[in-house]
Amino acid sequence: MSFVPGQENAGSRSSSGSRSGNGILKKTTWADQTERAGNNGNRGRRNQPKQTATTQPNSGSVVPHYSWFSGITQFQKGKEFQFADGQGVPIANGIPATEQKGYWYRHNRRSFKTPDGQQKQLLPRWYFYYLGTGPHAGAIYGDSIEGVFWVANSQADTNTRADIVERDPSSHEAIPTRFAPGTVLPQGFYVEGSGRSAPASRSGSRSQSRGPSNRARSSSNQRQPASTVKPDMAEEIAALVLAKLGKDAGQPKQVTKQSAKEVRQKILNKPRQKRTPNKQCPVQQCFGKRGPNQNFGGSEMLKLGTSDPQFPILAELAPTPGAFFFGSKLELVKKNSGGADEPTKDVYELQYSGAIRFDSTLPGFETIMKVLNENLNAYQKEAGGVDVVSPKPQRKGRRQAQEKKDEVDNVSVAKPKSSVQRNVSRELTPEDRSLLAQILDDGVVPDGLDDSNA
Protein backbone atom coordinates (compact mmCIF):
# COMPACT_ATOMS: atom_id res chain seq x y z
CA MET A 1 0.00 0.00 0.00
CA SER A 2 1.40 3.36 -1.01
CA PHE A 3 0.91 6.40 1.18
CA VAL A 4 -0.22 9.81 -0.02
CA PRO A 5 0.97 12.75 2.12
CA GLY A 6 -1.83 14.97 3.39
CA GLN A 7 -4.55 12.30 3.32
CA GLU A 8 -5.86 10.64 6.46
CA ASN A 9 -6.93 7.55 4.49
CA ALA A 10 -3.90 6.45 2.52
CA GLY A 11 -5.41 3.16 1.41
CA SER A 12 -6.31 4.32 -2.06
CA ARG A 13 -3.60 4.02 -4.61
CA SER A 14 -2.68 7.03 -6.62
CA SER A 15 -3.15 6.96 -10.37
CA SER A 16 -0.57 9.63 -11.07
CA GLY A 17 1.82 7.14 -12.63
CA SER A 18 2.10 3.54 -13.83
CA ARG A 19 3.10 0.99 -11.22
CA SER A 20 6.21 -1.10 -11.63
CA GLY A 21 6.70 -4.64 -10.53
CA ASN A 22 8.13 -3.73 -7.11
CA GLY A 23 5.04 -1.74 -6.12
CA ILE A 24 6.75 1.65 -6.41
CA LEU A 25 5.39 4.21 -8.81
CA LYS A 26 7.60 5.09 -11.70
CA LYS A 27 9.28 8.45 -11.63
CA THR A 28 7.28 11.28 -13.11
CA THR A 29 9.74 12.84 -15.48
CA TRP A 30 9.93 16.45 -16.59
CA ALA A 31 8.77 15.44 -20.07
CA ASP A 32 5.69 13.71 -18.63
CA GLN A 33 4.76 16.85 -16.68
CA THR A 34 5.19 19.06 -19.75
CA GLU A 35 3.05 16.78 -21.92
CA ARG A 36 0.31 16.61 -19.30
CA ALA A 37 0.26 20.37 -18.93
CA GLY A 38 -0.07 20.73 -22.71
CA ASN A 39 -2.97 18.29 -22.86
CA ASN A 40 -4.82 20.14 -20.13
CA GLY A 41 -4.47 23.46 -21.91
CA ASN A 42 -7.61 22.97 -24.01
CA ARG A 43 -9.78 22.80 -20.89
CA GLY A 44 -9.64 26.54 -20.52
CA ARG A 45 -7.39 26.87 -17.43
CA ARG A 46 -4.07 25.23 -16.96
CA ASN A 47 -3.26 23.83 -13.54
CA GLN A 48 -0.06 25.29 -12.16
CA PRO A 49 2.04 23.57 -9.49
CA LYS A 50 2.36 25.38 -6.20
CA GLN A 51 5.60 25.80 -4.26
CA THR A 52 7.56 23.43 -6.52
CA ALA A 53 10.99 23.47 -8.02
CA THR A 54 11.27 25.89 -10.86
CA THR A 55 9.98 24.70 -14.22
CA GLN A 56 11.48 27.49 -16.29
CA PRO A 57 14.71 27.04 -18.28
CA ASN A 58 17.51 28.95 -16.55
CA SER A 59 21.16 28.85 -15.83
CA GLY A 60 20.54 26.76 -12.71
CA SER A 61 19.79 23.06 -12.75
CA VAL A 62 16.21 22.07 -13.58
CA VAL A 63 14.52 19.81 -11.04
CA PRO A 64 12.47 17.27 -13.05
CA HIS A 65 10.49 16.10 -9.99
CA TYR A 66 7.84 17.70 -7.84
CA SER A 67 8.38 17.67 -4.10
CA TRP A 68 5.45 17.07 -1.78
CA PHE A 69 6.51 20.06 0.34
CA SER A 70 7.39 23.70 -0.07
CA GLY A 71 11.07 24.51 -0.22
CA ILE A 72 13.54 25.92 2.27
CA THR A 73 15.38 28.94 0.90
CA GLN A 74 18.78 30.20 1.94
CA PHE A 75 18.93 33.94 2.62
CA GLN A 76 22.32 34.28 4.29
CA LYS A 77 25.60 33.37 2.60
CA GLY A 78 28.10 31.04 4.20
CA LYS A 79 25.56 28.96 6.16
CA GLU A 80 25.36 25.17 5.97
CA PHE A 81 22.13 23.28 5.46
CA GLN A 82 21.91 20.62 8.16
CA PHE A 83 19.57 19.06 10.73
CA ALA A 84 20.28 17.16 13.92
CA ASP A 85 19.92 13.36 13.92
CA GLY A 86 16.28 12.32 13.92
CA GLN A 87 15.11 15.75 12.71
CA GLY A 88 14.45 17.37 9.35
CA VAL A 89 11.64 15.21 7.89
CA PRO A 90 8.55 17.32 7.13
CA ILE A 91 5.37 16.11 8.81
CA ALA A 92 2.22 15.33 6.84
CA ASN A 93 -1.08 13.67 7.66
CA GLY A 94 -1.27 10.04 6.63
CA ILE A 95 2.47 9.31 6.73
CA PRO A 96 3.53 6.95 9.53
CA ALA A 97 6.83 7.42 11.36
CA THR A 98 8.30 4.35 9.65
CA GLU A 99 8.02 6.07 6.26
CA GLN A 100 9.49 9.40 7.36
CA LYS A 101 12.86 9.12 5.63
CA GLY A 102 14.41 10.79 2.64
CA TYR A 103 16.73 13.59 1.63
CA TRP A 104 16.85 17.32 0.99
CA TYR A 105 17.95 18.23 -2.52
CA ARG A 106 19.74 21.52 -3.25
CA HIS A 107 18.35 23.34 -6.26
CA ASN A 108 20.73 25.94 -7.69
CA ARG A 109 18.51 28.76 -8.82
CA ARG A 110 19.01 31.03 -11.79
CA SER A 111 21.13 34.15 -11.90
CA PHE A 112 19.90 37.61 -12.81
CA LYS A 113 21.43 40.82 -14.08
CA THR A 114 21.66 43.80 -11.73
CA PRO A 115 21.01 47.37 -12.92
CA ASP A 116 24.76 47.95 -13.20
CA GLY A 117 25.11 45.00 -15.59
CA GLN A 118 26.59 42.44 -13.20
CA GLN A 119 25.37 38.86 -12.91
CA LYS A 120 24.15 37.88 -9.46
CA GLN A 121 23.40 34.31 -8.46
CA LEU A 122 20.35 33.64 -6.31
CA LEU A 123 21.02 31.60 -3.19
CA PRO A 124 19.90 27.95 -3.47
CA ARG A 125 16.58 26.45 -2.39
CA TRP A 126 16.22 22.97 -0.89
CA TYR A 127 13.39 20.48 -1.56
CA PHE A 128 12.54 17.28 0.31
CA TYR A 129 12.02 13.92 -1.39
CA TYR A 130 11.13 10.63 0.28
CA LEU A 131 13.66 7.82 0.04
CA GLY A 132 13.33 6.13 -3.34
CA THR A 133 11.74 9.13 -5.08
CA GLY A 134 12.91 12.35 -6.66
CA PRO A 135 16.13 13.17 -8.53
CA HIS A 136 18.12 10.51 -6.62
CA ALA A 137 15.51 7.77 -6.44
CA GLY A 138 18.13 5.07 -6.99
CA ALA A 139 20.51 6.27 -4.26
CA ILE A 140 21.03 4.39 -1.01
CA TYR A 141 20.41 6.23 2.23
CA GLY A 142 23.60 7.91 3.39
CA ASP A 143 25.36 8.00 0.01
CA SER A 144 27.77 10.91 -0.34
CA ILE A 145 26.14 13.06 -3.02
CA GLU A 146 26.89 16.71 -3.67
CA GLY A 147 23.87 18.85 -2.79
CA VAL A 148 22.05 16.10 -0.85
CA PHE A 149 21.41 15.99 2.92
CA TRP A 150 19.88 12.79 4.32
CA VAL A 151 17.26 12.89 7.10
CA ALA A 152 15.14 10.21 8.79
CA ASN A 153 12.88 9.65 11.76
CA SER A 154 14.38 7.54 14.52
CA GLN A 155 11.65 4.91 13.92
CA ALA A 156 12.21 4.69 10.15
CA ASP A 157 14.06 1.81 8.45
CA THR A 158 16.52 3.46 6.08
CA ASN A 159 17.43 0.16 4.40
CA THR A 160 14.17 0.11 2.43
CA ARG A 161 12.53 2.66 0.20
CA ALA A 162 9.64 4.75 1.46
CA ASP A 163 6.31 3.58 0.10
CA ILE A 164 5.24 7.09 -0.95
CA VAL A 165 3.76 7.99 -4.30
CA GLU A 166 5.29 10.83 -6.29
CA ARG A 167 3.24 13.98 -6.48
CA ASP A 168 1.15 14.83 -9.52
CA PRO A 169 0.78 18.66 -9.52
CA SER A 170 -2.50 18.41 -11.41
CA SER A 171 -4.03 16.43 -8.54
CA HIS A 172 -2.13 17.45 -5.43
CA GLU A 173 -0.80 20.79 -4.32
CA ALA A 174 2.44 21.09 -2.41
CA ILE A 175 2.10 20.95 1.37
CA PRO A 176 3.56 23.84 3.41
CA THR A 177 6.65 22.48 5.13
CA ARG A 178 6.20 21.88 8.87
CA PHE A 179 8.42 20.06 11.31
CA ALA A 180 7.88 18.16 14.54
CA PRO A 181 8.09 20.17 17.78
CA GLY A 182 11.67 20.72 18.87
CA THR A 183 13.13 20.76 15.37
CA VAL A 184 15.85 23.36 14.90
CA LEU A 185 15.78 25.03 11.51
CA PRO A 186 19.20 25.61 9.92
CA GLN A 187 20.48 29.11 10.59
CA GLY A 188 20.34 31.39 7.58
CA PHE A 189 17.35 29.57 6.00
CA TYR A 190 13.60 30.10 6.01
CA VAL A 191 10.64 27.95 5.00
CA GLU A 192 8.81 29.15 1.91
CA GLY A 193 5.30 30.30 2.82
CA SER A 194 5.89 30.29 6.59
CA GLY A 195 4.08 32.98 8.53
CA ARG A 196 2.18 34.23 5.48
CA SER A 197 -1.57 34.28 4.99
CA ALA A 198 -1.47 34.88 1.22
CA PRO A 199 -0.80 31.25 0.18
CA ALA A 200 -3.66 30.04 2.37
CA SER A 201 -6.06 32.55 0.88
CA ARG A 202 -4.98 31.69 -2.65
CA SER A 203 -5.40 27.98 -1.86
CA GLY A 204 -8.89 28.63 -0.54
CA SER A 205 -9.93 30.54 -3.65
CA ARG A 206 -8.61 27.80 -5.90
CA SER A 207 -10.31 25.05 -3.88
CA GLN A 208 -13.68 26.77 -4.25
CA SER A 209 -13.35 26.70 -8.04
CA ARG A 210 -12.20 23.08 -8.21
CA GLY A 211 -15.10 21.36 -6.51
CA PRO A 212 -15.84 19.67 -3.17
CA SER A 213 -13.17 16.97 -3.46
CA ASN A 214 -10.32 19.46 -3.64
CA ARG A 215 -11.91 21.54 -0.89
CA ALA A 216 -11.80 18.48 1.33
CA ARG A 217 -8.11 18.00 0.62
CA SER A 218 -7.43 21.68 1.23
CA SER A 219 -9.24 21.59 4.57
CA SER A 220 -7.32 18.50 5.59
CA ASN A 221 -4.07 20.34 4.90
CA GLN A 222 -5.20 23.23 7.04
CA ARG A 223 -5.86 20.88 9.97
CA GLN A 224 -2.21 19.94 10.23
CA PRO A 225 -0.71 20.66 13.63
CA ALA A 226 1.31 23.83 13.75
CA SER A 227 5.03 23.37 14.12
CA THR A 228 7.12 25.09 16.72
CA VAL A 229 9.60 25.97 13.99
CA LYS A 230 8.14 29.24 12.68
CA PRO A 231 11.05 31.58 11.96
CA ASP A 232 10.00 35.21 11.84
CA MET A 233 11.83 36.52 8.82
CA ALA A 234 11.28 40.18 9.69
CA GLU A 235 12.97 39.80 13.07
CA GLU A 236 15.80 37.67 11.69
CA ILE A 237 16.59 40.06 8.87
CA ALA A 238 16.36 43.07 11.20
CA ALA A 239 18.74 41.39 13.64
CA LEU A 240 21.21 40.67 10.84
CA VAL A 241 21.10 44.27 9.64
CA LEU A 242 21.58 45.63 13.15
CA ALA A 243 24.44 43.23 13.77
CA LYS A 244 26.10 44.37 10.55
CA LEU A 245 25.78 47.98 11.69
CA GLY A 246 27.26 47.12 15.08
CA LYS A 247 24.11 47.88 17.03
CA ASP A 248 22.32 45.90 19.71
CA ALA A 249 18.77 45.01 18.74
CA GLY A 250 17.74 44.47 22.36
CA GLN A 251 18.61 47.78 24.01
CA PRO A 252 18.89 51.36 22.79
CA LYS A 253 22.46 52.61 22.61
CA GLN A 254 23.33 54.95 25.47
CA VAL A 255 25.59 57.94 24.94
CA THR A 256 28.37 57.97 27.54
CA LYS A 257 30.99 60.62 28.18
CA GLN A 258 33.57 58.51 26.40
CA SER A 259 31.38 57.97 23.33
CA ALA A 260 30.45 61.67 23.23
CA LYS A 261 34.14 62.57 23.39
CA GLU A 262 34.91 60.20 20.52
CA VAL A 263 32.11 61.69 18.41
CA ARG A 264 33.32 65.21 19.15
CA GLN A 265 36.91 64.36 18.27
CA LYS A 266 35.82 62.66 15.07
CA ILE A 267 33.94 65.79 14.00
CA LEU A 268 36.80 68.14 14.89
CA ASN A 269 39.27 66.04 12.91
CA LYS A 270 37.36 66.88 9.74
CA PRO A 271 38.08 70.01 7.69
CA ARG A 272 36.17 73.02 8.96
CA GLN A 273 33.81 73.13 5.99
CA LYS A 274 32.90 69.45 6.49
CA ARG A 275 31.91 69.62 10.15
CA THR A 276 28.35 69.05 11.33
CA PRO A 277 27.67 70.44 14.82
CA ASN A 278 25.37 68.49 17.13
CA LYS A 279 24.80 67.88 20.84
CA GLN A 280 28.18 66.19 21.31
CA CYS A 281 30.06 68.87 19.37
CA PRO A 282 28.25 72.24 19.67
CA VAL A 283 28.45 75.07 17.15
CA GLN A 284 31.09 77.11 18.96
CA GLN A 285 33.44 74.12 19.24
CA CYS A 286 33.12 73.53 15.51
CA PHE A 287 33.22 77.12 14.27
CA GLY A 288 34.18 79.39 17.16
CA LYS A 289 32.48 82.21 19.08
CA ARG A 290 29.68 84.26 17.59
CA GLY A 291 30.60 87.68 16.29
CA PRO A 292 30.31 89.99 13.27
CA ASN A 293 31.77 87.39 10.89
CA GLN A 294 29.80 84.44 12.31
CA ASN A 295 26.55 86.02 13.36
CA PHE A 296 24.01 83.18 13.21
CA GLY A 297 22.70 81.11 16.10
CA GLY A 298 20.78 81.70 19.29
CA SER A 299 21.65 80.08 22.60
CA GLU A 300 19.48 76.99 22.00
CA MET A 301 20.64 76.40 18.45
CA LEU A 302 24.27 76.87 19.47
CA LYS A 303 23.87 73.98 21.93
CA LEU A 304 22.03 71.57 19.63
CA GLY A 305 23.49 72.47 16.25
CA THR A 306 21.86 70.52 13.46
CA SER A 307 19.96 68.49 16.09
CA ASP A 308 17.79 71.53 16.76
CA PRO A 309 14.17 70.82 15.66
CA GLN A 310 14.14 74.12 13.75
CA PHE A 311 17.25 73.39 11.72
CA PRO A 312 15.73 71.11 9.02
CA ILE A 313 13.51 73.90 7.69
CA LEU A 314 16.55 76.18 7.49
CA ALA A 315 18.45 73.49 5.60
CA GLU A 316 15.94 73.93 2.77
CA LEU A 317 17.57 77.30 2.11
CA ALA A 318 21.11 75.92 2.01
CA PRO A 319 22.66 76.01 -1.49
CA THR A 320 23.67 72.88 -3.30
CA PRO A 321 27.35 72.36 -4.20
CA GLY A 322 26.51 73.43 -7.74
CA ALA A 323 24.78 76.59 -6.55
CA PHE A 324 27.70 77.34 -4.24
CA PHE A 325 30.34 77.20 -6.97
CA PHE A 326 28.38 78.57 -9.89
CA GLY A 327 26.11 81.02 -8.09
CA SER A 328 28.61 82.75 -5.81
CA LYS A 329 31.46 85.20 -6.16
CA LEU A 330 34.64 83.27 -5.37
CA GLU A 331 38.11 84.55 -4.64
CA LEU A 332 41.23 82.55 -3.88
CA VAL A 333 43.44 84.21 -1.26
CA LYS A 334 46.81 82.98 -0.02
CA LYS A 335 47.27 83.21 3.75
CA ASN A 336 50.35 83.17 5.93
CA SER A 337 50.67 80.10 8.10
CA GLY A 338 52.70 79.13 11.12
CA GLY A 339 55.41 80.87 13.08
CA ALA A 340 59.12 81.23 12.55
CA ASP A 341 59.87 77.87 14.16
CA GLU A 342 57.13 75.99 12.26
CA PRO A 343 57.53 74.39 8.82
CA THR A 344 56.33 76.57 5.99
CA LYS A 345 53.23 75.44 4.12
CA ASP A 346 50.99 77.12 1.61
CA VAL A 347 47.54 77.93 2.97
CA TYR A 348 44.72 79.29 0.86
CA GLU A 349 41.24 80.55 1.57
CA LEU A 350 38.43 80.25 -0.93
CA GLN A 351 36.43 83.32 -0.01
CA TYR A 352 32.87 83.52 -1.26
CA SER A 353 29.91 85.84 -1.24
CA GLY A 354 26.43 85.35 -2.58
CA ALA A 355 22.75 85.48 -1.76
CA ILE A 356 19.83 83.10 -1.34
CA ARG A 357 16.60 84.56 -2.71
CA PHE A 358 13.14 83.40 -1.63
CA ASP A 359 9.65 84.86 -1.34
CA SER A 360 6.42 84.36 0.57
CA THR A 361 5.31 81.50 -1.70
CA LEU A 362 8.02 79.26 -0.24
CA PRO A 363 6.45 76.47 1.88
CA GLY A 364 6.95 77.27 5.55
CA PHE A 365 7.76 80.90 4.78
CA GLU A 366 6.43 82.26 8.09
CA THR A 367 8.31 79.67 10.13
CA ILE A 368 11.52 80.34 8.21
CA MET A 369 11.23 84.08 8.83
CA LYS A 370 10.59 83.47 12.54
CA VAL A 371 13.63 81.22 12.91
CA LEU A 372 15.85 83.59 10.93
CA ASN A 373 14.81 86.61 13.01
CA GLU A 374 15.47 84.68 16.22
CA ASN A 375 18.95 83.55 15.22
CA LEU A 376 20.40 86.34 13.04
CA ASN A 377 22.71 88.51 15.19
CA ALA A 378 21.33 86.79 18.28
CA TYR A 379 24.68 87.30 19.99
CA GLN A 380 24.01 91.06 20.08
CA LYS A 381 20.48 90.75 21.42
CA GLU A 382 21.45 88.42 24.24
CA ALA A 383 24.30 90.72 25.36
CA GLY A 384 22.37 94.02 25.11
CA GLY A 385 24.04 95.18 21.92
CA VAL A 386 27.59 94.25 22.93
CA ASP A 387 29.50 91.64 20.94
CA VAL A 388 29.57 88.38 22.78
CA VAL A 389 33.18 87.33 23.08
CA SER A 390 33.37 85.43 26.31
CA PRO A 391 36.51 86.27 28.32
CA LYS A 392 38.79 83.44 29.24
CA PRO A 393 37.99 82.11 32.72
CA GLN A 394 40.48 83.34 35.31
CA ARG A 395 42.25 80.87 37.50
CA LYS A 396 41.31 80.68 41.14
CA GLY A 397 44.57 82.22 42.44
CA ARG A 398 44.38 85.16 40.06
CA ARG A 399 40.73 85.78 40.98
CA GLN A 400 41.53 85.81 44.72
CA ALA A 401 44.39 88.26 44.18
CA GLN A 402 42.05 90.53 42.23
CA GLU A 403 39.44 90.42 45.03
CA LYS A 404 42.11 91.29 47.62
CA LYS A 405 43.27 94.23 45.52
CA ASP A 406 39.67 95.49 45.27
CA GLU A 407 39.35 95.38 49.07
CA VAL A 408 42.50 97.51 49.45
CA ASP A 409 41.18 99.99 46.91
CA ASN A 410 37.96 100.38 48.89
CA VAL A 411 39.83 101.66 52.01
CA SER A 412 39.61 105.48 52.36
CA VAL A 413 43.03 107.16 52.48
CA ALA A 414 43.56 110.95 52.76
CA LYS A 415 45.50 112.17 49.78
CA PRO A 416 46.75 115.68 48.93
CA LYS A 417 44.73 117.40 46.25
CA SER A 418 47.71 118.71 44.32
CA SER A 419 51.47 118.85 44.22
CA VAL A 420 51.41 122.52 45.30
CA GLN A 421 49.53 121.65 48.47
CA ARG A 422 52.10 118.99 49.27
CA ASN A 423 54.91 121.60 48.82
CA VAL A 424 53.16 124.11 51.13
CA SER A 425 52.85 121.61 53.91
CA ARG A 426 56.64 121.15 54.20
CA GLU A 427 59.03 123.71 55.91
CA LEU A 428 60.28 126.52 53.62
CA THR A 429 63.98 127.02 53.08
CA PRO A 430 65.62 130.53 53.04
CA GLU A 431 65.72 130.40 49.24
CA ASP A 432 62.01 129.60 49.15
CA ARG A 433 61.23 132.52 51.45
CA SER A 434 63.25 134.94 49.31
CA LEU A 435 61.54 133.76 46.12
CA LEU A 436 58.12 133.94 47.73
CA ALA A 437 58.71 137.47 48.98
CA GLN A 438 59.73 138.57 45.50
CA ILE A 439 56.60 137.05 43.97
CA LEU A 440 54.37 138.70 46.53
CA ASP A 441 55.97 142.08 45.87
CA ASP A 442 55.18 141.69 42.16
CA GLY A 443 51.49 140.97 43.00
CA VAL A 444 51.38 137.66 41.11
CA VAL A 445 49.83 134.65 42.84
CA PRO A 446 51.12 131.33 41.55
CA ASP A 447 48.66 128.57 40.56
CA GLY A 448 47.48 126.60 43.53
CA LEU A 449 47.95 129.44 46.08
CA ASP A 450 45.02 131.55 47.15
CA ASP A 451 44.03 133.63 50.14
CA SER A 452 43.09 130.58 52.14
CA ASN A 453 46.65 129.26 51.91
CA ALA A 454 48.36 132.57 52.68
UniProtKB/Swiss-Prot annotation:
Superkingdom in the source lineage: Viruses
Bias (Low complexity): 11-21, 193-227
GO CC terms, sorted: host cell endoplasmic reticulum-Golgi intermediate compartment; host cell Golgi apparatus; ribonucleoprotein complex; viral nucleocapsid
Binding site for RNA: R109, R125, R167
PTM summary: ADP-ribosylated. The ADP-ribosylation is retained in the virion during infection. Phosphorylated on serine and threonine residues.
Cited PROSITE patterns: COV_N_CTD (PS51929), COV_N_NTD (PS51928)
Protein name per Swiss-Prot or TrEMBL: Nucleoprotein
Biological classification of the source: Viruses, Riboviria, Orthornavirae, Pisuviricota, Pisoniviricetes
